[in-house]
Structure formats: C-alpha cells, structure tokens
Amino acid sequence: MSLTINKMLNIKGRTCLITGACGKVGQALSLALSEMGCNLILLDHPKTNLKELKNQISKKFKNEIILIPCDLESSREIDEVNLSIEKNFNSLDILINNAAFVGSSNLKGWATSLENQSLDTWRRAIEVNLTASFKLIQNTKKFLEKSSHASIINIGSIYGIYGPDLSIYENTNMNNPAAYSVSKAGLLQLTRWMSTVLAPKIRVNSISPGGIFRNQPEEFVKRYIHKTPLKRMGSESDVVGAAVYLSTDLSSWVTGQNIIVDGGWGVW
C-alpha cells in the first residue's frame, strides 16, 4: 500500500547535518528541519555564533541539537566531524552542504573586476564551496549508509549553470566572482557523480537558488526583478521548500537532480 502524504512528509527523529548553519539560508534550514522533528548537527566556522542559533531553535522546538565549530578550509577539522557524529548519534539521515563563500562575502580580491580577482581567494573558494563538500560526503558515507532514508542535498547556484549578466551590477559595489560560479558548477557535477556512486543506499540532489533579497542596492534589485518572470527576488523560504522536499520521502525516487529555484530567471 502506498504511503500517505503525511507519512511521506514525516521525518521526525531523523538526524540532519547542516553546514553553514549560521548563514541566512542555514538558519532557515535549521529552523525548518527542527520544526519537522529532526535532530540537528549544526556546523559553521568557529567565529560564528552557533550557540545563539541553538538557543533560538531550542526556544521553539525540543529536538536534540549538536554544535560543531569547524573551519572547512581545514581537512583535519573536517575529519573530526565524524567523532561528533559517532559520539552523539552514530548515524545520519540527511546531509545538507550549504556552507560557501558567496558573492557578498568580505574577501580580498573577490567581488571585483576580473583583473583584480585574487588567485589565493579563488583557491579558498574552491576549498570551501566544493572540496569541503566532497570531503564531508566521503567521511559521512558510513553513517548515511545506516539510514533507510539517506539524502544528501548540495546547495548550488544559478551561477553554476548560467553566466552572469554584469549589467545588473553597474554602478553598485557588487560583482560576480568567477570562483563562485566555477565552484558551484563543480558542486552540481559532484552531485551527479555521487548520485550514481552512492546509489541505491543514498540519494544525492542539489538545489540552485537564484538571487536572494538581502537589502541590495535598489537599482540592482530593480534590474534583477526585471529579468525574473515571477517579478521578485528569492527568499530563504524558497530554498527551504525545495530542501524539505528532498529531505523527505516525497522525493524517495529522485536522485542526481538539480532543482532550480530562481523565479524563472533561466527560462528566457
């Protein structure tokens, strides 16, 4: 007999690891998965305030929350993530690779003209946005294989698919770093590669959001909306909707796919 929608949506008691948990999207994902009854392993850079996020969630929900301060540029620190999983849960149902340097990250030689983009920052972005996801999947595979509902979700970007239209950035302090696009494109291919290698025990999919509204300059927002059929920028909730779908049994026969959440940006 087929499952009901409520049963397919039920992920209460499952364990989810979210990287970049303190970012805007990471916080929204953490709250949403908590609301659905998941136990959480929240990972972010040691300089972020993971404890504050835990307190915020604990005021609303009673699930178990483990915090892992981790510099994703450090292979040694990534290896230590397994120790926390083993100690606290010894299994994993959902891995969301969300951490990344993004276009607005405050990095030297990052969101600037091509001529001024730094090779050192390029390497750092590849390390955090792509290599760390590979390493985490590699390390957590043994825990995910214990689950009968294992799902990996990689957070990509429309700029892993499309080239940028630099005209929307004119006369703003914004730009589109090459390393961001390239690292996200690599993450999408990693998704496809892992989906066949880890099948049938583990599903692997990605979500590619378009631009999310973050109080960008008014002129940029107007230009962005003009190019978007649904006539608005995205929100964290738009990403959460796709992530919930991929976390639950609603998507139990979906793997190797990239869900583009961009308000129609790419269909012109």
Give the predicted meaning of each segment.
Residues 2-7, 164-167, 171, 244, ...:
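Short C-terminal tail/terminal secondary-structure segment
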Residues 22-24:
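Conserved glycine-rich cofactor-binding loop
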Residues 38-52:
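Conserved glycine-rich Rossmann-like NAD(P)H-binding loop of the short-chain dehydrogenase/reductase
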Residues 80-87, 106-127, 223:
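Active-site Tyr-X3-Lys motif and surrounding loop/helix of classical short-chain dehydrogenase/reductase
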Residues 98-110, 264:
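Conserved NAD(P)H cofactor-binding loop of Rossmann-fold oxidoreductase domains
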Residues 115, 119-121, 145, 153-199, ...:
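Catalytic loop of short-chain dehydrogenase/reductase
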Residues 149, 199-203, 254-256:
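Short, small/polar-rich loop/turn modules that mediate ligand/substrate recognition or access, typified
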